[in-house]
From Swiss-Prot:
Protein task: Participates in the translocation of lipoproteins from the inner membrane to the outer membrane. Only forms a complex with a lipoprotein if the residue after the N-terminal Cys is not an aspartate (The Asp acts as a targeting signal to indicate that the lipoprotein should stay in the inner membrane).
NCBIfam families associated with the record: lolA (TIGR00547)
Compartment annotation: Periplasm
Protein name: Outer-membrane lipoprotein carrier protein
InterPro entries registered for this protein in UniProt: LolA/LolB/LppX (IPR029046), OM_lipoprot_carrier_LolA-like (IPR004564), OM_lipoprot_carrier_LolA_Pbac (IPR018323)
Family as reported in the entry's similarity comment: Belongs to the LolA family.
HAMAP family assigned to the protein according to its UniProt record, in alphabetical order: LolA
A GO BP annotation: lipoprotein transport
Top-level taxon of origin: Bacteria
Originating species: Shewanella pealeana (strain ATCC 700345 / ANG-SQ1)
UniProt-listed Pfam families: LolA
Subunit organization: Monomer.
Cellular compartments per GO CC: outer membrane-bounded periplasmic space
Annotated signal sequence range: 1-22
Length: 208
């Protein structure tokens, strides 16, 4: 179950640097460029293909341009994902494990994570449809692990994100108590490896 949370979280940060493209992409870009930094609480509900709730969670979510992301699941089981602008750190306190990959590897692990980049060639692989206050984002590659992402706004606030995977699971995130990133919050994007944890450095593996 934690894998579902992790895949969903890796897909979240990444609505920040969408390039200008035709139609729905242009409209979504305007919305996203109004959000330079963001910190909020989130509540997450995961349902299966039969609409049965299989997990709930809550935590803290933060974004800052460029390519910085903080996702701290505080319940039911703690986990932490931090993107510091170059690397993505995934920490499981219960297992005492840390995985680290570079931004490009995170993109490969979760194709929707491509939203962190402003690369036009990359975004040509995705379709964006404007449905009023919400936007549907879907990969043209049907083998992608994430089949669709919906992001919703209330004027200039990002209020909701819904991720659907190929197994029929839906992760619904609702954001509350939103504020811009304060000066004392900037350290959220700096991950310090705890003592006595196992480190799976996938950056090194990718170079071999």
């Amino acid at each position: 179950m934690k894998k579902i949370f992790t895949i969903a979280a890796l897909s979240l940060p990444l609505f920040c640097h969408l390039p200008a493209m035709a139609g729905g992409q242009d409209d979504l870009k305007v919305k996203l460029m109004e959000i330079n930094t963001l910190k909020a609480n989130f509540n997450q509900t995961v349902t299966d293909i039969n609409q049965k709730v299989i997990q709930t969670g809550e935590g803290v979510f933060a974004l800052s341009h460029p390519n910085q992301f903080y996702w701290h699941l505080t319940a039911p089981d703690e986990s932490l994902i931090v993107a510091d602008g170059t690397d993505v750190w995934i920490y499981n306190p219960f297992a005492e494990e840390v995985s680290v990959m570079d931004i490009n590897q995170a993109i490969n692990a979760s194709p929707i994570a491509l939203l962190v980049h402003s690369d036009d060639a990359t975004w040509s692989q995705y379709d964006v449809v404007n449905n009023g206050d919400c936007f549907d984002i879907s990969p043209r590659d049907k083998d992608s692990g994430v089949s669709e992402v919906e992001v919703c706004f209330n004027q200039q606030q990002l209020t909701k994100m819904v991720l659907k995977d190929q197994q029929g699971n839906t992760s619904d995130f609702t954001l509350t108590n939103q504020t811009p990133i304060a000066e004392n919050d900037k350290d959220l994007f700096k991950f310090i490896v705890p003592d006595d944890v196992d480190i799976d450095d996938q950056r090194l593996k990718s170079q071999n």
